[in-house]
């Protein structure tokens, strides 16, 4: 489901983590350089484990951004109320009056009109969404590379609302691995093999092979129905709609000469591993790397991933009823903010925070589970890494 935009969803500008006392002395770091910072991103005590989820203790954080053309001429309160609707207008009025929102380091009146290129800072109590409690298992470790089994629901690196509840953040808290350079991405709900370089030189080595088309990758998926026994190659363009957060596939050969095909070229090879008549296990080898490529190409074949919340709806008459049945059967779990209300013994409650005393951020309520798509192998010139199959990969 879609959530109202929070500042956490804004990747523009600069951000820094701070404490209430050290707010003026903490080091500023660019979002792009966050992975390469020598300071600790996370520590073990940052996490709370409850109800099958890994939560992050809320912490103070300062967002820094610069006034762009669209913002210029707005009052400071209108800017935040219009651009970041995840908090009510009254909150922003209070934040400006109290100095939690500043312009060029100065407290300004609520009627202040912002000007181009001014620096705006917002000091707030940050709550991150929870992730599934599964460990980040180290599969293979060398001086210049480490491979892990990424659990579903955990982003690879800091982005959007996630910072500490990421693979990079969890590894920083639980293992002394130093600087980390993830060399490829997996969607948040996808699990499996993740390769992480430990030196810039090794990261560049992998990058050159990936960009040169020298790397092969393989996933497994659990799909609806009896997948064809013969190998199937899907060659269909993928068009990603950022506002909807989903992709569509279109076959260039069936579009007609007078119709322009949307999206980018994409190709995936599928091979059936097993079937029980209701579901099939399928080996998936993406030749290209488009957004949601495997998921949308499987939907295109008529055999979508059997628990895919985005691409299953066209193949289930009543998706809400289907999900409800799986919840009743214990196959899915609902995470709701109302399930997690804590006291000051668990974390410091901020009187101005719109999330406290709840642990989960406002607007977060999802049917969060492991998507039945798992990366099992990456191989290139002179190297190969694998990841064991997940528990759902049986029929």
From Swiss-Prot:
Residues 74-136 form the S4 RNA-binding domain. Residues 1-21, 244-263 are annotated as: Disordered. CDD domains: PseudoU_synth_ScRIB2. SUPFAM superfamilies: Pseudouridine synthase (SSF55120). Its EC number is 5.4.99.-. GO terms for molecular function: pseudouridine synthase activity; RNA binding. Keywords: Isomerase, RNA-binding. Residues 244-255 have a biased composition (Polar residues). It is an enzyme of class 5 (isomerase). The active site is at 187. It catalyses: a uridine in RNA = a pseudouridine in RNA. One of its GO terms (biological process) is pseudouridine synthesis. Belongs to the pseudouridine synthase RluA family. NCBIfam families: rluA_subfam (TIGR00005). This is RNA pseudouridine synthase 7.
């Amino acid at each position: 489901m879609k959530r109202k935009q929070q500042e956490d969803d804004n990747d523009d500008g600069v951000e820094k983590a701070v404490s209430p006392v050290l707010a003026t002395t903490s080091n500023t770091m660019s979002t792009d350089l966050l992975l390469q910072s020598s300071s600790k991103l996370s520590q073990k005590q940052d996490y709370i484990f409850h109800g099958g989820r890994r939560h992050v203790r809320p912490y103070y954080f300062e967002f820094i951004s610069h006034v762009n053309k669209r913002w210029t001429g707005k009052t400071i309160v209108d800017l935040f109320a219009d651009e970041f609707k995840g908090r009510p207008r009254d909150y922003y009025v209070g934040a400006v009056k109290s100095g939690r929102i500043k312009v060029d380091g100065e407290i300004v009146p609520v009627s202040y009109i912002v000007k181009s290129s001014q620096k705006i800072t917002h000091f707030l109590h940050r709550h991150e969404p929870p992730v599934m409690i599964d460990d980040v298992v180290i599969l293979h470790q060398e001086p210049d590379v480490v491979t892990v089994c990424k659990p579903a629901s955990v982003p690879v690196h800091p982005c959007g609302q996630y910072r500490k509840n990421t693979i990079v953040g969890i590894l920083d808290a639980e293992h002394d691995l130093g600087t980390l350079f993830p060399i490829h991405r997996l969607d948040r709900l996808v699990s499996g093999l993740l390769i992480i370089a430990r030196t810039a030189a090794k990261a560049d080595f992998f990058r050159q092979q990936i960009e040169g088309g020298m790397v092969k990758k393989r996933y497994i998926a659990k799909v609806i129905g009896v997948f064809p026994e013969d190998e199937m190659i899907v060659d269909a363009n993928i068009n990603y709609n950022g506002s909807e957060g989903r992709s569509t596939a279109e076959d260039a050969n069936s579009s007609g000469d007078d119709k322009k095909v949307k999206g980018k070229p994409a190709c995936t090879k599928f091979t059936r591993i097993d079937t029980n008549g209701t579901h099939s296990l399928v080996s998936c080898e993406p030749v290209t790397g488009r957004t949601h490529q495997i998921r949308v190409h499987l939907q295109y074949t008529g055999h979508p991933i059997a628990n895919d919340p985005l691409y299953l709806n066209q193949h289930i008459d009543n998706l809400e009823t289907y999900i409800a049945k799986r919840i009743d059967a214990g196959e899915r779990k609902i995470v709701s903010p109302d399930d997690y209300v804590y006291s000051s013994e668990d974390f410091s409650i901020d009187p101005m925070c719109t999330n406290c005393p709840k642990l989960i951020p406002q607007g977060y309520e999802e049917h969060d589970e492991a998507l039945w798509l798992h990366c099992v192998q990456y191989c290139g010139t002179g190297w190969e890494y694998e990841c064991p199959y997940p528990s759902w990969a049986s029929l």
